[in-house]
UniProtKB/Swiss-Prot annotation:
This is Toll-like receptor 2. LRR repeats lie at residues 54-77, 78-101, 102-125, 126-150, 151-175, 176-199, 200-223, 224-250, 251-278, 279-308, 309-337, 338-361, 362-388, 389-414, 415-437, 438-457, 458-478, 479-500, 501-524. The gene is TLR2. It comes from Capra ibex. PANTHER family: TOLL-LIKE RECEPTOR, TOLL-LIKE RECEPTOR 2. The lineage of its organism: Eukaryota, Metazoa, Chordata, Craniata, Vertebrata. Residues 639-782 form the TIR domain.
């Protein structure tokens, strides 16, 4: 019994393990190229069953704690491995030994407290390694990266426990495109630790305090192109001139991101620019200046200029004591060499005239997302301000008058590019004044409703996107590029107004269509972006767009940007894929064909009516409908005749000389209705026939070959036919005056033919001895 329990327990464990492994393997989604995605799947281990077909494996943001020697041994073609944001605390020595093709490895934000060089000894082609955010204090006892000759991007350190950088740490690395060191709590930096790296393109340094900053800078200043300092409090920073005076520097760009300054530390940083003479660009991003701009009493007067700095960028500068801040006049003399200045989203409402006049080399000025208005712009763009300025960006400020703005900028003689987008202009005056060299103007998102002659005729590039324009009728003879997307235009602009236009962006309007003739009217058009409009996919439009292969080279957003809005059955489809029916595209031909078919149908109907007496049927239907309006059966007192006699004119002798004599002169006499004597003059013949039949108890048909050929006999027979079979009575008496073939009776009198086949009719005897019996039978039939 215990043995059985033990066996059951073992099988349960094996089953659970197998099921778990299967579940984990199924949690990966892999495409045919070998890219497998398993991020954020709550995995607690690396899935089993991985093969050589896997080239990219993403297991980030899971709960993996351990990487074993066999977990990845079959992934010999793996190039990208992402294990970041897990709980990994252990990596076995040979875990990555078989990954000889690995180029990208991310182990960031795990729980690794120790790093081993054996992990990387076979990763000769590794280019990217991220070890940020783990728990280690140092980079190991031995040189960690000595086996990585092709490494180009390295990220190491953490924000808490990483405290020491030793000389051996970066041995073996000669060239890095990017090195990021997170060392907010750095306590020890051994000199020359970074000096072994001969060239670093971009160094990102996270330091909370600046104590060791100068030591690091001394080691890298001759091999570094681009230094980025993050999350640092520079309140206590002091620049020692002696320590760096002998160094040949190569740093070209310096960025301070989320860094705090004081008036004093800012001066120390400016000193640095004089000695690191290669710096061409300085950027302050999301920084805080804890001071009031009081530089006059400091050593700023010993600094003649900002080194060789040509580009100065300031974004989101916070000044807690903004309303106590000085006028900065003491730094004006330092700005003479600066060519490009960007001060963005920093609550700037004024550039003092004196500062503008000192910026003698300035070519580009960006004051986006600030508080500039026409009143302050008047002071900023004063006489002799920014003498060489070519580009001015005043996007998203507080400008309201286009006329005043243009007038205030007349002092800028060299200005050719002006961006005043996202200001609230609303309207445009009829005339304006602009600097004489204006070539580019950005008026996008200014809520203007129409364009006027206010725009300068010298423009080569105009952006009026995202406004309320419903037409474009300006003559701009030099305009080469027009950006007019997201407006309310219904058609392309007139090409005669824009003779040299080469680029037009007109997407997001309400244009229904455009034609080959319209595009051909722009002789120099090379790029057209017209997607996102409400295209009516007519036959002509589809034929044009789908039939012009060269059109794809002009339409930059073809084919995905072009969708049909109508007809409804192709709405939402790409114009390239839409198909219309033959009737929609060849309406005239279809209508002609239908008309021809209708004509043939009418012709055929006429032939059939003639052949099968269709006209007769219609006449009879009309007569029957007329007769239906009268009482179905005349009252007894309205019957005037014993019988109505229907006969052919050729048989009138027999009727008038024999029948009338035998019936009307008999005692008692019969009263007959004959059309010759009893029809009412002036009354329609058809009405006479109908009235006579209805006023007679019987209808006598004198049948002969002449009767069958007589048109009026047919009418009389027709209406009696309706009476007989609509009222279902036996009012008809047939007299066969001479033998006739029953087939000679028209097919349309089917019921009459049936009577002749089923009921007795009187036949006129040629033998005189039998004629008396004939008249006797006829009188009896009339009385019945």
């Amino acid at each position: 019994m215990p043995r059985a329990l033990w066996t059951a327990w073992v099988w349960a464990v094996i089953s659970a393990f197998t099921e778990g492994a299967s579940d984990q393997a199924s949690s990966l989604s892999c495409d045919p190229t070998g890219v497998c995605d398993g991020h954020s799947r709550s995995l607690n281990s690396i899935p089993s069953g991985l093969t050589a077909g896997v080239k990219s494996l993403d297991l980030s943001d899971n709960e993996i704690t351990y990487v074993g020697n066999r977990d990845l041994q079959r992934c010999v073609n793996l190039k990208t491995l992402r294990l970041g944001a897990n709980e990994i605390h252990t990596v076995e020595e040979d875990s990555f030994f078989h990954l000889r093709n690995l180029e990208y490895l991310d182990l960031s934000y795990n729980r690794l407290s120790n790093l081993s060089s054996s992990w990387f000894r076979s990763l000769y082609v590794l280019k990217f390694l991220n070890l940020l955010g783990n728990l280690y204090k140092t980079l190991g006892e031995t040189s960690l990266f000595s086996h990585l000759p092709n490494l180009r991007t390295l990220k190491v350190g953490n924000s808490n426990s990483f405290t020491q950088i030793h000389e051996k740490d970066f041995t073996g690395l000669t060239f890095l495109e990017e090195l990021e060191i997170s060392a907010q709590n750095l306590q020890l930096y051994v000199p020359k630790s970074l000096k072994s790296i001969q060239n670093i393109s971009h160094l990102i340094l996270h330091l909370k305090q600046p104590v060791l900053l100068l030591d690091i800078l001394i080691d890298i200043v001759s091999s570094l192109d681009y230094l980025e300092l993050r999350d640092t409090n520079l309140h206590t920073f002091y620049f020692s001139e002696a320590s760096i005076s002998e160094i040949n520097t190569s740093v070209k760009k310096l960025i301070f991101r989320n860094v705090q300054f004081t008036d004093e530390s800012f001066v120390e940083v400016v000193k640095l620019f004089n000695y690191v003479s290669g710096i061409l660009e300085v950027e302050f991003d999301d920084c805080t200046h804890d001071g009031i701009g009081d530089f006059t009493a400091l050593t700023l007067n010993r600094i003649r200029y900002l080194g060789n700095v040509e580009t100065l960028t300031i974004r989101k500068l916070h000044i807690p004591q903004f309303f106590l801040f000085y006028d900065l006049s003491s730094i004006y003399p330092l700005t003479g060499k600066v060519k490009r200045v960007t001060i963005e989203n920093s609550k700037v409402f004024l550039v003092p005239c004196l500062l503008s006049q000192h910026l003698k080399s300035l070519e580009y000025l960006d004051l986006s997302e600030n508080l500039m208005s026409e009143e302050t712009l008047r002071n900023s763009a004063c006489e002799h301000a920014w003498p060489f300025l070519q580009t001015l960006v005043l996007r998203q400020n507080r400008l309201k008058s286009l006329e005043k703005t243009g007038e205030l900028l007349l002092t800028l003689k060299n200005l050719n590019n002006l961006d005043i987008s996202k200001n609230n202009f609303l309207s445009m005056p009829e005339t304006c004044q602009w600097p004489g060299k204006m070539k580019q103007l950005n008026l996008s998102s200014t809520r203007i409703h129409s364009l006027t002659q206010c725009l300068p005729q010298t423009l080569e590039i105009l952006d009026v996107s995202n406004n309320n324009l419903d037409s474009f009728s300006l003559i701009l003879p030099q305009l080469k590029e027009l950006y007019i997307s997201r407006n309310k235009l219904k058609t392309l602009p007139d090409a005669s107004f824009l003779p040299v236009l080469s680029v037009m962006r007109i997407s997001g309007n309400i244009i229904n269509t455009f034609s080959k003739e319209q595009l051909d009217s722009f002789p120099q058009l090379k790029a057209l972006e017209a997607g996102g409009n409400n295209f009516i996919c007519s036959c002509d439009f589809l034929s044009f767009t789908q039939g012009q292969q060269a059109l794809a080279r002009v339409l930059v957003d073809w084919p995905d940007g072009y969708r049909c809005d109508a007809p409804s059955h192709v709405r939402g489809q790409r114009v390239q894929d839409a198909r219309l029916s033959l009737s929609e595209c060849h309406r005239a031909a279809v209508v002609s064909a239908v008309c021809c078919a209708l004509f043939l149908l009418l012709l055929l109907t006429g032939v059939l009516c003639h052949r099968f007496h269709g006209l007769w049927y219609m006449k009879m239907m009309w007569a029957w409908l007329q007769a239906k309006r009268k009482p179905r059966k005349a009252p007894r007192r309205d019957l005037c005749y014993d019988a109505f006699v229907s006969y052919s004119e050729q048989d009138s002798y027999w009727v008038e000389n024999l029948m009338v004599q035998e019936l009307e002169h008999f005692n008692p006499p019969f009263k007959l209705c004959l059309h010759k004597r009893d029809f009412v003059p002036g009354k329609w013949i058809i009405d006479n026939i109908i009235d006579s039949i209805e006023k007679s108890r019987k209808t006598i048909f004198v049948l002969s070959e002449n009767f069958v050929r007589s048109e009026w006999c047919k009418y009389e027979l027709d209406f009696s036919h309706f009476r007989l079979f609509d009222e279902n009575n036996d009012a008809a008496i047939l007299i066969l005056l001479e033998p006739i073939d029953k087939k000679a009776i028209p097919q349309r009198f089917c019921k009459l033919r049936k009577i002749m086949n089923t009921k007795t009719y009187l036949e006129w005897p040629t033998d005189e001895t039998q004629q008396e019996a004939f008249w006797l039978n006829l009188r009896a039939a009339i009385r019945s």
